[in-house]
């Protein structure tokens, strides 16, 4: 039974729902790992001192293009 403050999904009542719960957990882990990797790359690019100004001309707009869709989806 679901509760108002419950963060996860309800308990499965059928085998199909059980598989959907496993798929949800697996997909959520993949999304988390990809988001962590993208965040690490952005932080590494912003904080490094060894950048060429011609290589990273529009770094700020690229960060916005990367982060904004993630924020909208969350």
Curated annotation (Swiss-Prot):
Mitochondrial matrix-facing ranges: 46-74
Disulfide-linked positions: none
Cofactor note: Binds a dinuclear copper A center per subunit.
The keyword Transmembrane is assigned to this record: yes
Predominant place of localization: mitochondrion
Residue ranges crossing the lipid bilayer per the database entry: 15-45
Compartment annotation: Mitochondrion inner membrane
GO MF, one annotated term: cytochrome-c oxidase activity
Its biological purpose: Component of the cytochrome c oxidase, the last enzyme in the mitochondrial electron transport chain which drives oxidative phosphorylation. The respiratory chain contains 3 multisubunit complexes succinate dehydrogenase (complex II, CII), ubiquinol-cytochrome c oxidoreductase (cytochrome b-c1 complex, complex III, CIII) and cytochrome c oxidase (complex IV, CIV), that cooperate to transfer electrons derived from NADH and succinate to molecular oxygen, creating an electrochemical gradient over the inner membrane that drives transmembrane transport and the ATP synthase.
Name of the protein: Cytochrome c oxidase subunit 2
Lineage, top ranks: Eukaryota, Metazoa, Chordata, Craniata, Vertebrata
Gene that this polypeptide is encoded by: mt-co2
